[in-house]
């Protein structure tokens, strides 16, 4: 599984680097986190978490600072979180998380993305029950046992720790992701490839040929929407 996350990170980093929409999406997420609490990341753990993720996605500092400055101002722009679930070709499933200032626009766009790209929208809960919500932390290393012990000593609810090809992947209860990151940093680990709350599929499907091409197009269209923050799937390599 560690290699899977490394591959996903490499793929997304290549895409993110050429996609200014990613900067805008993180700008909104940073603004919302800063607006909900203190605009200082040292006292607002939710904001610090988003900023760390933005840095992993190579979001420039000026974009981060601009979003925080906007939150410090008098703007009253509000954003609403949403979740949509649906199906792609040949047993593929998707969960789409959104953050939007216009719920009607976003719902219509997500529905159109599914309908025009070989997918079908499902009812709430039709897909998510086949996924598990977990915290995921990925970093360089090879001693999974010592990391597991370290996290247990820090009273972190750890689901699993895997080591593969020089990469360690930690899975935690979603509520303990931040605690895990803090414990790892205090142990001397400074660089992380992934620090995310993820929806992990209980089983994966493998697509090929036309099915894979159709699925890739569906995911691309969804991720290109300015209101879509995350797309989770049960397809290998995604």
Swiss-Prot record:
GO terms for cellular component: cytosol. Its main location: cytoplasm. It is found in: Cytoplasm. Keywords: Cytoplasm, DNA-binding, Transcription, Transcription regulation. One of its GO terms (molecular function) is DNA binding. Pfam families: TACO1_YebC_N, Transcrip_reg. InterPro entries: Integrase-like_N, TACO1_YebC-like_2nd/3rd_dom, TACO1_YebC_N, Transcrip_reg_TACO1-like, Transcrip_reg_TACO1-like_dom3, Transcrip_reg_TACO1_YeeN, YebC-like. GO terms for biological process: regulation of DNA-templated transcription. HAMAP family: Transcrip_reg_TACO1 (MF_00693), Transcrip_reg_TACO1_YeeN (MF_00918). Belongs to the TACO1 family. YeeN subfamily. This is Probable transcriptional regulatory protein SGO_0454. It comes from Streptococcus gordonii (strain Challis / ATCC 35105 / BCRC 15272 / CH1 / DL1 / V288).
């Amino acid at each position: 599984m560690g290699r899977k996350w490394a591959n996903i990170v490499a793929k997304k980093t290549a895409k993110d680097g050429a996609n200014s929409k990613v900067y805008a999406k993180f700008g909104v997420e940073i603004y919302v986190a800063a607006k909900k609490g203190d605009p200082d990341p040292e006292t607002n753990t939710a904001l610090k978490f988003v900023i760390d993720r933005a840095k992993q996605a190579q979001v420039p500092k000026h974009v981060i600072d601009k979003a925080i400055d906007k939150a410090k101002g008098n703007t009253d722009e509000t954003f609403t979180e949403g979740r949509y679930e649906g199906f792609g070709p040949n047993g593929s499933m998707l969960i789409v998380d959104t953050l939007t200032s216009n719920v009607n626009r976003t719902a219509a766009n997500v529905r159109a993305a599914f309908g025009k790209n070989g997918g079908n929208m499902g009812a709430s809960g039709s897909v998510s029950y086949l996924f598990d919500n977990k915290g995921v932390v990925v970093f360089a290393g090879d001693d999974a046992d010592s990391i597991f012990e370290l996290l247990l000593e820090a009273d972190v609810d750890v689901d699993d720790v895997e080591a593969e090809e020089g990469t360690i992947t930690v899975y935690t209860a979603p509520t303990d992701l931040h605690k895990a990151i803090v414990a790892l940093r205090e142990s001397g680990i400074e660089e992380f490839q992934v620090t995310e709350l993820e929806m992990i599929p209980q089983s994966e499907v493998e697509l090929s040929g036309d099915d894979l091409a159709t699925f890739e197009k569906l995911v691309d269209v969804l991720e290109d929407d300015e209101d879509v923050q995350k797309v989770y799937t049960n397809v290998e390599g995604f």
